[in-house]
């Protein structure tokens, strides 16, 4: 932990008013413990700043400033090479103006696409000698799912830009185990990836709540009901189940790409209106198993906020096996059932034995508890201070 007074500059150009609020709070808490004497300045669009500021009112030494978000001009899409480049250049100018002449310990870009990777990350050594951490949320995973047919647009997206090396002072910050290794396979020349396991807020922890003695086991899909998160698989799973001792729920908001699905079999359906964080967490506390049919390759490159919510509530998983879950299990032990395919998922649920679940559950919950403890901001702070290295 450093005692000299320095400054940490944080920039979130991508998040809308409510996007990534829990993580941004968690990250601020990690930084506050890691560098207790530093001044922290957080910049984002005005609505995001207004929502985040009261969440960290108990922390001192943090200033908030509104800034222009990543906005392609002329109504252009962020996938448009010209629009994305112009928006990224504007973000870079904002960062340059904010850090010039400051006693900077660290700058962090809280979300990065291909445009920001090129304009800010690859050019950072021209801006500052301080370290820059670019936090990888779902942008690389999204780029693995959909890519433009336009060759110029493809050359500027993150799936292409990730192959370009970064200055030594710039790190791409992965938020889950296994992501670094997945990027190493995709882009062997990129040696800039470091890992900060996704923090989990102590204020959102739940105590263990065993299933009701003779009630139904409640299996839930969490978060935005997008196809890429596997909601269509979950809806089909619920519709195909003929078991009266299982109850299927969707806790989160509806998504346009799955709006056509039949969800009449769900005891709780995706919400048509915004859902408060408190209502969401209360609903998660009331279920028994979290189903994460993350079948897309995107989740080899993405930290799942849904998994963090399951850990916070100590809820075991039924999930598709992927690189991140393999890495989590290798470090902490099993946290539920992992399946290889949709067919295996359907078979597992059709044959799920309550007694077998109850017998395995104590070990799973103990491992979830170990993950939760390790990912407290206070526990992550020392390692992150070393990672920053200043």
Stretch-by-stretch model annotation:
Residues 84-86, 93-117, 131-133, 289:
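Short N-terminal targeting/anchoring amphipathic segment
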Residues 292-308, 320-322, 326-327:
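Nucleotide-sugar-dependent
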Residues 18-22, 340-350, 354-389:
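A charged, aromatic-enriched C-terminal amphipathic alpha-helix characteristic of glycosyltransferases
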Residues 201-204, 212-263, 274-278:
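Conserved catalytic-core segment of nucleotide-activated headgroup transferases in glycan assembly
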Residues 34-86, 253-257:
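N-terminal strand-loop element at the rim of the active site
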Residues 11-29, 47-52, 226-229:
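A short, glycine/small-residue-rich beta-strand->loop->alpha-helix junction that serves as a flexible
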Residues 8-9, 107-109, 124-146:
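Active-site proximal beta-strand in glycosyltransferases
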Residues 140-142, 149-173:
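Membrane-proximal helix-turn-helix segments that form the acceptor-binding/catalytic region
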């Amino acid at each position: 932990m450093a005692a000299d007074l320095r400054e940490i500059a944080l920039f979130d150009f991508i998040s809308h008013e409510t996007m990534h609020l829990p993580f941004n709070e968690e990250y601020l808490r990690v930084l506050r413990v890691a560098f207790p004497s530093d001044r922290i300045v957080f910049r984002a669009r005005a609505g995001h700043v207004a929502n985040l500021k009261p969440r960290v009112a108990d922390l001192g030494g943090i200033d908030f400033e509104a800034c222009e978000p990543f906005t392609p001009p002329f109504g252009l899409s962020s996938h448009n090479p010209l629009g994305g480049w112009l928006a990224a250049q504007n973000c870079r100018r904002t960062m340059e103006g904010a850090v010039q002449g400051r006693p900077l310990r660290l700058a962090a870009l809280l979300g990065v696409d291909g445009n920001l990777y090129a304009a800010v990350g690859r050019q950072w050594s021209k801006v500052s000698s301080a370290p820059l951490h670019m936090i990888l949320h779902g942008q690389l995973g999204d780029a693995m799912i959909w890519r433009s047919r336009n060759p110029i647009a493809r050359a500027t997206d993150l799936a292409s830009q990730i192959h370009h090396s970064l200055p030594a002072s710039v790190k791409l910050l992965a938020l889950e185990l296994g992501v670094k290794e997945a990027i190493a396979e995709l882009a062997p020349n990129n040696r800039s990836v470091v890992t900060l396991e996704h923090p989990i807020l102590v204020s959102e922890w739940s105590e263990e709540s065993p299933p009701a003695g003779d009630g139904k086991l409640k299996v839930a899909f969490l978060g935005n009901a997008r196809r890429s998160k596997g909601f269509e698989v979950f809806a089909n799973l619920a519709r195909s189940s003929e078991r009266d001792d299982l109850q299927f729920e969707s806790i989160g908001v509806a998504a346009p790409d799955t709006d056509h699905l039949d969800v009449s079999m769900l005891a709780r359906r995706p919400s048509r209106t915004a859902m408060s964080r408190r209502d969401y967490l209360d609903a998660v506390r009331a279920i028994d198993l979290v189903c994460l049919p993350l079948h897309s390759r995107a989740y080899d490159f993405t930290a799942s906020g849904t998994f963090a919510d399951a850990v916070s509530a100590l809820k075991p998983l039924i999930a598709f096996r992927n690189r991140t879950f393999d890495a989590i299990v290798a470090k902490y032990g099993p946290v539920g059932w992992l399946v290889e395919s949709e067919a295996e998922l359907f078979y597992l649920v059709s044959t799920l034995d309550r007694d077998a679940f109850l017998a395995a559950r104590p070990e799973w919950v103990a491992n979830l508890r170990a993950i939760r403890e390790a990912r407290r901001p206070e526990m992550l702070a020392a390692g992150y201070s070393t990672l920053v290295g200043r």
